[in-house]
Regions:
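Catalytic nucleophile loop
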Residues: 22-46
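Conserved catalytic-core motifs of eukaryotic protein kinase domains, centered on the activation segment
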Residues: 6-9, 41, 51
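Flexible gly/pro-rich beta->alpha loop and the following alpha-helix that scaffold active-site loops
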Residues: 1-30
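Acyltransferase
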Residues: 125-185
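Glycine-rich, phosphate-binding/catalytic loops in enzymes
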Residues: 11-15, 47-48, 101, 135-137
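Residues at alpha-helix caps and immediate loop-helix transition turns in enzyme cores, especially N-
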Residues: 7-11, 94, 129
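Pocket-forming structural segment of enzyme catalytic cores
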Residues: 43-128
Length: 185
């Protein structure tokens, strides 16, 4: 599924409207993979289908200088393990700030304004998801065992970074990350 596949996936029209509203009202938004691609294209960036920057598997991501200072990545090492599963890739929109890159894909994360972030990598996966995705696609199914083994080897640092990043986002969105409740003034 890609950013322009609204005929095949009509719900994307509503998702795009939701993203536009979040950006307009500065409602905290974290777009992951397709979500980051949708955010990028709605902000004037370009998304390349079947990009040479497509990545699948467990890979290193490097924060830029701006990424090291961004509150989404507070407490996260300059280089960290990520999980990638994308054929398409986004170009950072003109008014956005590049936060992270990888050796294969210059745009791994960006921020627009104070409350909208897009990532190409997946901070939300676990072993079951990695195994499912690897077996799901004809291209990757013969290598599913390797994808899962690579993820398991990197799982501990991956989980530490993912939990920190997602916790940072929830805190920025106004949730008390100690007990999962919304902060009240």
């Amino acid at each position: 599924m890609g950013v322009h596949d609204t005929a095949e996936h009509p719900f994307l029209v509503e998702v795009k409207a939701f993203i536009r509203a979040c950006v307009r009202t500065e409602t905290p938004l974290l777009g992951i993979c397709l979500g980051g691609q949708l955010l990028a294209v709605l902000l004037g960036g370009r998304v390349t289908a079947n990009s040479p920057c497509g990545e699948k598997g467990t890979m290193e991501v490097t924060l830029t200088s701006a990424g090291k200072e961004d509150p989404l990545f507070a407490g996260i090492p300059h280089e960290f393990v990520s999980f990638q599963w994308h054929n398409d890739s986004f170009e950072i929109p003109a008014d956005a700030t590049l936060l992270a890159s990888s050796s294969a894909c210059a745009g791994q994360a960006f921020r627009f304004g104070a409350m909208a972030w897009g990532t190409q990598f997946h901070p939300e996966v676990d072993r079951a998801i990695v195994d499912c995705w690897a077996r799901w696609e004809e291209e990757t199914a013969p290598h599913a065992t390797r994808f899962l083994a690579d993820f398991v080897l990197a799982e501990q640092p991956y989980l530490e970074v993912s939990r920190r990043m997602l916790g940072n986002f929830l805190g920025l969105a106004g949730f008390d990350t100690d007990n999962g409740t919304e902060k009240r003034p």
